Regions:
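Rossmann-like short-chain dehydrogenase/reductase
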Residues: 2-141, 154
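C-terminal helical subdomain
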Residues: 81, 131-134, 138-175
Length: 175
């Protein structure tokens, strides 16, 4: 199933990957600068503050590996600092966009607070940025969720079929 869901023609463009070693406050600037350097239009941003190793083969996806982030405040601040400049660039260029927030797996109180915060961030920003056609969506993996499941959902949301989703949270692996 993954091979058909993640076929290259679903997402056209350039893949950008930035490490969390870049200061979070400068992440958005780095995204915009790198896209300008490549003369690429970035219309999808994936924020992964979980610290998992992320390999991006999908074009027009910016992956942020937040390996150095520890608590819920770091996760939420990092997500906001990554999303805001990208959304600002889309608004200025009058372009739509997808902001995909990948939450950490369930765990202690800090992980649960970060998950709830990212879900609320997606809901709130979907209302604030709907007039600009910017679609924030959160993915909340369960304890037993496989990386392929997250990848398939992310590919679906980044495809034209995912254009109808905004401000929602997808909880994977829960009954």
């Amino acid at each position: 199933m993954s091979a058909t869901v993640l076929r290259p023609e679903l997402l056209q463009g350039v893949a950008l990957t930035l490490a969390a070693a870049d200061p979070p406050s400068r992440f958005g600037e780095a995204v915009i600068a790198r896209a300008a350097e490549l003369r690429a239009a970035v219309d999808r941003v994936v924020v992964d503050p979980t610290g998992d190793e992320v390999e991006s083969r999908e074009p027009d996806v910016v992956v942020w590996d937040g390996a150095s982030l520890a608590g819920p405040r770091d996760v939420l601040d990092g997500a906001w600092l990554a999303l805001r400049p990208a959304a600002g660039a889309w608004i200025a260029a009058e372009r739509p966009g997808l902001l995909l927030l990948l939450a950490p797996p369930p765990g202690d109180a800090g992980a649960e607070a970060a998950r709830a915060g990212l879900e609320n961030l997606a809901r709130t920003l979907s209302i604030e940025w709907a007039r600009y056609a910017i679609r924030p969506v959160a993915i909340l993996p369960g304890e037993a969720t496989e990386p392929e499941e997250v990848a398939e959902l992310a590919a679906f949301l980044a495809s034209p079929a995912g254009d109808y989703y905004s401000g929602c949270a997808f909880r994977l692996g829960e009954a």
